[in-house]
């Protein structure tokens, strides 16, 4: 058996790749709670792929059969209800862990040099994930699915010159119909998952090229030959590790990182299963009541709002009275996230060693983003619209203020070694 494994290893160095990118990957030893969400995102991705495959076996991608096929899955397919709820709950769980993953990058400066490309790959994953969720949202062919897609797709019509043609191309018809459903199904099941998986591979490769950031925002890599003896004393089981990697204050991902992540996975699965079995609709935020009615082009729901993970950007859109300018503002609210590495001109990464102004700016940005998420799910009354305008201003002011104060920001001295605050 060992001879066969050696033969395969010489032709396909899978074990070397496993050691380099997983078991012996150098992980800063002061990783904390905020460093769980990358692994959790991978776990949810596996859940979405597996449950999606099973749902596809019984789903009918046509205007006549889509809603009925979902009802069939829920009522007649053995454990079909469980698979459907695992997929719908998983979609929201995906965005929960992704938003927390992005927030960790924000507070610890994981977007700064030399990790700009790593951040961009992460933002591209977020963008594709939003497209994937939007395409999948139409597939149940319920009332909110239909009219939510109608509202979002119509926004492209506001783009000058190409707007009408672009809207027609996205829909595949002059109205949202079975042709739109077929198109979205193909993109949701085949095209976008391929792009998503490719971007995840690039994201991981970029991470392993520059190394992981840590809560202190300092590098753990040192010139060759400078590894301290304290590492061998603390982790005698990995004496050979120091011969391969000249990295101080780091530990192998396995078993230390895997054990840490397993604790997070256990906590996550507890919460996930609680929602799955006791509150899968989550009060209408995960699965809206109108979506249990078949799509009816002649009956508009009283209040149309996207799923919760789109509402912050939807609130920015509604905050601007002009349709075209609203689309521009919504697009800008996503584009500025891509440009974050160049807005922040400070040499210090982590908020721990930056000014109080920076901490206040992060807090007001977080409050603005959450408030926009709440307002985006509410009706567009004059009061809510005014609040959305105020919080939209706060959202964009984060980036403007960051660019101004970060250049000459008063920072605290950085530690020479990682700390365990």
Question: Language-model segments: which ranges?
Answer:
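Membrane-embedded and interfacial regions of multi-pass energy-transducing membrane proteins
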Residues: 1-93, 97-421
């Amino acid at each position: 058996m060992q001879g066969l494994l050696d033969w395969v290893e010489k032709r396909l160095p899978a074990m070397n790749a496993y050691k380099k990118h997983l078991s012996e990957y150098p992980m800063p030893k002061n990783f904390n709670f905020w460093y769980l969400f990358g692994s959790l995102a991978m776990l949810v991705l596996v859940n979405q792929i597996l449950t999606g495959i099973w749902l596809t076996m019984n789903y009918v991608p046509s205007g006549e059969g889509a809603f009925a096929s979902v009802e069939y899955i829920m009522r007649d397919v053995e454990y079909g209800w469980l698979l459907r709820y695992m997929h719908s709950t998983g979609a929201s769980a995906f965005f929960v862990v992704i938003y927390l993953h992005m927030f960790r990058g924000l507070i610890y400066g994981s977007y700064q040099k030399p990790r700009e490309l790593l951040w961009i790959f992460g933002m591209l994953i977020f963008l594709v994930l939003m497209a994937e969720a939007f395409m999948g949202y139409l597939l149940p062919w319920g009332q909110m699915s239909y009219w939510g897609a109608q509202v979002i797709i119509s926004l492209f019509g506001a783009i000058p010159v190409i707007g009408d043609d672009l809207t027609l191309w996205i829909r595949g018809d002059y109205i949202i119909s079975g042709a739109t459903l077929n198109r979205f199904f193909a993109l949701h099941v085949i095209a976008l998952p391929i792009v998503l998986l490719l971007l995840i591979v690039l994201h991981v490769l970029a991470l392993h090229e520059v190394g992981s950031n840590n809560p202190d925002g300092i590098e753990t890599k040192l010139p060759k030959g400078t590894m301290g003896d304290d590492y061998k004393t603390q982790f005698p089981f990995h004496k050979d590790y120091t011969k391969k990697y000249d990295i101080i204050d780091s530990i192998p991902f396995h078993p230390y990182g895997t054990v840490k992540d397993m604790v997070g996975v256990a906590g996550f699965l507890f919460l996930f299963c609680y929602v799955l079995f006791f509150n899968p609709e989550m009060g209408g935020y995960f699965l809206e009541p109108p979506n249990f009615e078949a799509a009816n082009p002649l009956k508009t729901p009283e209040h149309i709002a996207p799923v919760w993970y789109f509402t912050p950007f939807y609130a920015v859109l509604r905050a601007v009275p002009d349709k075209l300018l609203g689309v521009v503002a919504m697009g800008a609210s996503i584009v500025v996230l891509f440009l974050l590495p160049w807005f922040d001109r400070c040499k210090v990464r982590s908020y721990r060693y930056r000014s109080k102004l920076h901490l206040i700016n992060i807090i007001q940005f977080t409050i603005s983003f959450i408030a926009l998420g709440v307002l985006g799910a509410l009706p567009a009354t004059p009061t809510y619209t005014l609040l959305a305008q105020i919080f939209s201003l706060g959202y964009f002011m984060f980036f403007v203020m960051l660019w101004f104060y970060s250049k000459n920001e008063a920072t605290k001295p950085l530690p020479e070694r990682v700390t365990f605050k």
